[in-house]
Amino acid sequence: MSSSEEVSWISWFCGLRGNEFFCEVDEDYIQDKFNLTGLNEQVPHYRQALDMILDLEPDEELEDNPNQSDLIEQAAEMLYGLIHARYILTNRGIAQMLEKYQQGDFGYCPRVYCENQPMLPIGLSDIPGEAMVKLYCPKCMDVYTPKSSRHHHTDGAYFGTGFPHMLFMVHPEYRPKRPANQFVPRLYGFKIHPMAYQLQLQAASNFKSPVKTMR
């Protein structure tokens, strides 16, 4: 990013295609070293990455080395993601994400009986690189893969495993009621007895695939 651009690095990053789930972290939060405790041990090129996020002038050596600049850019994205996971557990962060939730920015539950319930991003792990972001439905309380493939490469650790639950602890008034209806399998209009599934599983376990003949 050049110094002539008016948009901040944070706004630029959150505006990238595929980063729609992120909110813009307040710079005051990032500048408070207490909020960044321990992140210097997780992120390579920590100091340069932090300077990039805060739009501080880079070192001259960095400007003359494009390969190094790419590494710093990757580190800045990782650092911002980890800061973001902490920020959205604060009152200010929750308020920003709540607004996006109410606007349906994170998508809607694909389950029919959830009736287009808005969802929230969630991580299945707090460790970067272990799992991509998923979407949590507060109505059926299950998780789903984002519909758009552009979100399939967003690290789940940048949202954390506890974010949706913290949001509803702070704002219980936004917790939806559990679904009133549940799908009931039927055959010729009759409910299928649970024993039928057990019999099907037993039959499947005894089933042997036909031997393929060699041509």
Swiss-Prot record:
One of its GO terms (cellular component) is protein kinase CK2 complex. The modification Phosphoserine is found at S2. Its main location: nucleus. A motif (KSSR motif) lies at residues 147-150. It comes from the Eukaryota. SMART domains: CK_II_beta. PROSITE patterns: CK2_BETA. Phosphorylated by alpha subunit. GO terms for molecular function: metal ion binding; protein kinase regulator activity. Residues 188-193 are annotated as: Interaction with alpha subunit. Keywords: Metal-binding, Nucleus, Phosphoprotein, Wnt signaling pathway, Zinc. It is found in: Nucleus. InterPro entries: Casein_kin_II_reg-sub_N, Casein_kinase_II_beta-like, Casein_kinase_II_reg-sub. Zn(2+) binds at C109, C114, C137, C140. The keyword Zinc applies. One of its GO terms (biological process) is Wnt signaling pathway. Casein kinase II/CK2 is a tetramer composed of an alpha subunit, an alpha' subunit and two beta subunits. The beta subunit dimerization is mediated by zinc ions. Belongs to the casein kinase 2 subunit beta family. Regulatory subunit of casein kinase II/CK2. As part of the kinase complex regulates the basal catalytic activity of the alpha subunit a constitutively active serine/threonine-protein kinase that phosphorylates a large number of substrates containing acidic residues C-terminal to the phosphorylated serine or threonine. Participates in Wnt signaling. This is Casein kinase II subunit beta.
